């Protein structure tokens, strides 16, 4: 699919109501986090398993390129028509939080091309710890950080670390090399997240991202049960 563009002009915040998923609509899961934290690799890992179980598609957000979508296509994690991209310009958070129009249009195109869909993974462009998804765009969100930033990152907090539905601390296999204490990271994450779950993963040691996969499956099951209750 051709990329959806944001024109690069200043954008005003557009207030949208919180999304209420309708029966039969695909579940939308946002995956955000800083540059290099492993978002695209996590998306690829989830797709490799879920593509044999459900109907899934991916929407990526890149600043000026379609690099993340191209990576997923090169690695054939899904058929090309199930992967599309939004080019966000210089402010990647704008496209997922303030003016989500381009993402909503891209989602409509994915659904029209691939219906029926069970799940759409929406990957944000790389941003800082303050980036979050609009509740009008996604149903639940995952925020990915990695140990390379040091064990102080969970303690710093920020909306993504604190309020995401699932916090993923990635690349745990690198902890000894960067001097990060995983126990400290887990403790600090628990302190700021007030009971929200945290998954500590290494795609090197667990290529399927089993803990994250289980969380996604649980939300898919919940969505399926909700549909059948109507």
From Swiss-Prot:
- What gene is behind this protein? ureG
Identify its protein family: Belongs to the SIMIBI class G3E GTPase family. UreG subfamily.
| Cellular component terms (Gene Ontology) | cytoplasm
Per the UniProt entry, what are the Gene Ontology biological process annotations, in alphabetical order? urea catabolic process
* Membrane-spanning intervals of the chain: none
Q: Which SUPFAM superfamilies match?
A: P-loop containing nucleoside triphosphate hydrolases
- UniProt xrefs under PANTHER family: UREASE ACCESSORY PROTEIN G
Q: How does it assemble?
A: Homodimer. UreD, UreF and UreG form a complex that acts as a GTP-hydrolysis-dependent molecular chaperone, activating the urease apoprotein by helping to assemble the nickel containing metallocenter of UreC. The UreE protein probably delivers the nickel.
CDD domains according to UniProt? UreG (cd05540)
The residues that the entry says bind GTP are: 33-40
Function noted in UniProt: Facilitates the functional incorporation of the urease nickel metallocenter. This process requires GTP hydrolysis, probably effectuated by UreG.
Location of the protein in the cell: Cytoplasm
- The coiled-coil regions, if any, are none
Q: What is this protein called?
A: Urease accessory protein UreG
Write one Gene Ontology MF term. Answer: GTP binding
């Amino acid at each position: 699919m051709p990329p959806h563009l944001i024109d690069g002009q200043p954008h005003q915040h557009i207030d949208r109501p919180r999304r209420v998923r309708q029966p039969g609509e695909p579940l939308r899961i946002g995956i955000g986090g800083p540059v290099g934290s492993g978002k695209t690799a996590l998306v690829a890992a989830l797709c490799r398993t879920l593509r044999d179980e459900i109907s899934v598609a991916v929407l990526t957000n890149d600043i000026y390129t379609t690099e993340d979508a191209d990576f997923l296509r090169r690695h054939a994690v899904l058929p090309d028509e199930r992967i599309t991209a939004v080019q966000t310009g210089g402010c990647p958070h704008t496209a997922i939080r303030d003016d989500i129009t381009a993402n909503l249009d891209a989602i409509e195109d994915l659904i029209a091309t691939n219906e029926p869909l069970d799940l759409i993974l929406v990957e944000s462009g790389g941003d800082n710890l303050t980036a979050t998804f609009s509740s009008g765009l996604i149903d639940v969100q995952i925020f990915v950080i990695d140990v390379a930033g040091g064990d102080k990152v969970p303690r710093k907090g920020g909306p993504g670390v604190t309020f995401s539905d699932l916090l993923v601390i990635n690349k745990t296999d690198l902890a000894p090399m960067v001097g990060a204490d995983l126990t400290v990271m887990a403790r600090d994450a628990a302190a700021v997240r007030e009971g929200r779950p945290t998954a500590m993963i290494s795609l090197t040691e667990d290529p399927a991202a089993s803990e994250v996969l289980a969380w996604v499956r649980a939300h898919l099951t919940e969505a399926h049960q909700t549909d059948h209750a109507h």
